[in-house]
């Protein structure tokens, strides 16, 4: 069943495999009249791209091309087609994986579902698919910027290390998108240890949105938080999502968790900017739990396509963690959810 | 924007307010030929209904009526309309709340979004809306039972108390749907303390599904886990969702979190039955963090509709926790997600 | 597959069978703040209801009840549930049809699709289903009236008789909704002849909408005319749809068919108010071809459920033509299409 | 609002403007395991391509590239991205049209809707957009061929000339896709007259589908005929759609129009293969009325973007009629509708 589209009014459809000729996205429903150039998108793609020290050495340039929907530098209201051609494709690295199921990956589930799979670098299930999401998110960002909405994602935990302080300016200064410089330094040391050990790690990404008006979200199934949860959980390595106080709220008392209302607004934001599925006007705050990358060089038990036991040690170009590359992806998903809701009119009739 | 429908093939649309004449659901896409009687639905409604000691004393009978889609005791493939008339409606209890915004509720966000709100018992944002979900879930259960799929929800944490053991048979023996009798007894004591204190609490609900075939879920946005996350987060009091190891996975190493594959299947289930968004054939395991019920008699700071500060102490019939009533609701949402995916054919062409 | 919903923003879901307990519709996405009373809906239902001389003698009162979405006389933005209980249900009339397939009806296709069918009066495939559409259309009409849009349907051909003149005031003065009094009188004589002959007839319904702004319709698949065509063709007896000059345009020259543009607007309206799928601001004009009612007392050849040949003469309460009852139904479908598009914001960004 | 997607299970999204860098389509939901090569698609594209004598002299090669969804020559179940780069783009031809609204085109409605338009060759509203539909239809054809379904479109009327005979083999032998060789010859003469006169013409296209099983179509809004009507009316120049006897049925008696049922099946096919919105198993027959191409060199009255009157004579490369190029497009739309319904399982539960 078709599952590669997201959004109702600001609607995207992504396509492409890790080692196919190209990948891309069609954005349908973007309003006309928004200035848009490839550089607007390229900037965001650079933030998730491999080639940095932390991430895999695949030197993919990730040049985006705009194939439709923009005329004389401005969106026209028709579908915007973005494409990124895959240039550094070395499928040869993967031929030995054609007949083995990597633990923690979708190799076996894809084969069970489709009866066939593209085993080159994970095919459609590769993290590379998220480049298309980031490209679409960049377009959503342009639209939202014009409405005063700003979205920022950052790392709040990595390999069990947590941030202790929050400095917004620090986020783009370190390779972890971490708002705490001290924590970032510790994370860097942790990466080296894990690389030496042939192992990998996960972490927690937080996304916050400023400037959203009250009133976004549609009861009862398309609540703002429901859509955010679905959006973030659709990102490959994400295994948990929470809004505001999240899982901590489960252990709080009502008198602790309720955000008091004052004539100046809410006195706290345990709600994470969402009440009854509708935005309150406070910052929207969501967090995503990211599992460790399953590709490790440490030996693992698995089976091959004939069902025989195999000991597998995955070589090749792999990251130690989906963080930091997943950070701009989480940001993109929140941008896309908000763009979708922001497109809807305030439907109140004048009386 | 329309937001009261859920699902693509097994599609439900709910309607109704807490203190309106009735509430209900239309189930469109349920296969024909399934025996269905009101009692099949009534049984599940009883599990979430008020009137038990733990929950609010509203003595609503919640009698479901089947108005369409069933002929001679069997579904016909046409829409099934279920309705529950509200009989014990005392809106008078709420008139004093018509001009005040209750903290932690949707009173203010609804008014900001719609410019008008039904203040009787929360109107559409009331937990009562979930009766329609449970009714629809009961129909999904009938369909899934014929395919060998079984879904069960239970409480794993309540007011900071956690279960230590798991006994499936115990779940329906205590009012908390708790699989640990000792923990259930402690929870019961906690309820009394909170009621005396005029406060409320939350908890964590786990849902597990047995018997699902591998192959459910549609990459990349309609992944099984993405749909589960959106479904559970759409339930009123839920602020977090996790699959399998969930947030714990964020602090694990790849070598710990990966589920090894053996000739006999997966050796563990940190994935919670989902890899790359597609079911593995293992039990599907999801958890939802439930916030404390915001209606408490303990005094709170808030404002009225004129923006003036008010100290509010909420009287009337209110539960101490959304647990246990939310347990069958979480179960229903997972049933509905699975019914939707189970309706889709295995689309593989013979070669 | 679920197929009983229509519209994207102003979204309706209908349910109910001819001889079940009730039928109804859920309207999701209707803006808040619109005054709405049962009489607003009842008025439209009266226009399609049986009991008039022309139509079948089933004396169904068709009383609509509003079960949700309206508070203190005004829509709240939440789903509006409308129900009409079936009171004059004499299924006994149909028991002899349980084992025979009526020509021109859906008896056999429903059974082939679903493996089961509700044979009482056509079940879900009965024209009675359209009462729910008319009820929903009445709500759309209230919304559109506030935006200055007015929709009117009328009969332009009946049993081969065509209207020669157009008098808008005449439409509601004769039982055919015919804008030509002379033609209406001829139609009345034709009905008597056909009733005597035990036969039935069809005709053509035209729907025109005044006051629509330019800009409605979404290229390339959700064009305004594409949605109108799908909407009208979804009405049971409709076998053809055309916009503006329609089929006549197929035999015209470009120089004849093009509507010249002048500083005062379009000089003609062969386009029927739609160019490139987008409304022009001129009247929107659509026509639907209605086939003769298949239930006739004249003997017909058919087969029973065992495949044996049967000569069938259908007795009971049946209309001679779907006209006039189908006229308000076509009107409702156009109302629903326009409400859906009118809900969408003009998305142009200010530059 | 997003409007460039079509279908629910076999879902396509098209993009691209007449004179942009490229146009294309993403096909999401195509089953895995279907052999697919560029030539399978190229063959259908050739049938609609310009360059033949009848059509405009734009020598576009229309080479399709498959960018995703196919691995080792076989579909994988993931989205199939097809792209056609525009090579023969002479926008200069259109600069004089940047400030004038061509009658019968979408120039003015696009500008009214979006506030901006791509005036190069009609931009998104150009007939060139349909190349993407034909490419997607070719993939649907591959899928349907495996299920025994065959779809064929042909011209039954052109400039007021009608076919008198039907010879299936003749269809691909003449440039009109006309099943009557004598009529085709007359059409050819008519084209020359119109070209000399600087005028254009329309016609009627019929599409028939063989081999469809009974049971396709979803009551009550997604009826097979409703979807066909919406699909065909979404094609640029189409102004009318009919199924089976269509508009002629409006003047028939019930006793004439009903298709008698015999032990060997239906004795006639006035229904066009659809009863109550569900396929009967007979050939599905639909017709589309095609308006004359609005671009004519004969002088026309119009206005420019400043609202001033202009006499316009359109030069450049234009067809005399949308026929024959629209014939493969109508065929593609029916292929896409049928593929969508054929993907759905027969949902009957065994009892």
From Swiss-Prot, chains A, B, C, D:
Q: Which CDD domains match?
A: Chorismate_synthase (cd07304)
Indicate the transmembrane segments per the record.
Answer: none
Q: Which UniProt keywords apply?
A: Amino-acid biosynthesis, Aromatic amino acid biosynthesis, FAD, Flavoprotein, FMN, Lyase, NADP
**Highest taxon, organism lineage:** Bacteria
Q: Which PROSITE patterns match?
A: CHORISMATE_SYNTHASE_1, CHORISMATE_SYNTHASE_2, CHORISMATE_SYNTHASE_3
Q: Which SUPFAM superfamilies match?
A: Chorismate synthase, AroC (SSF103263)
Query: Do you know which InterPro entries this protein is assigned to?
Result: Chorismate_synth, Chorismate_synth_AroC_sf, Chorismate_synthase_CS
Q: Can you tell me which residues bind FMN?
A: 124-126, 276, 291-295, 317
Pathway assigned to this chain's UniProt record: Metabolic intermediate biosynthesis; chorismate biosynthesis; chorismate from D-erythrose 4-phosphate and phosphoenolpyruvate: step 7/7
**Chemical reaction(s) catalysed:** 5-O-(1-carboxyvinyl)-3-phosphoshikimate = chorismate + phosphate
Entry's family note: Belongs to the chorismate synthase family.
HAMAP family of this UniProt entry? Chorismate_synth
Protein name per its UniProtKB record: Chorismate synthase
What species does this protein belong to? Answer: Syntrophobacter fumaroxidans (strain DSM 10017 / MPOB)
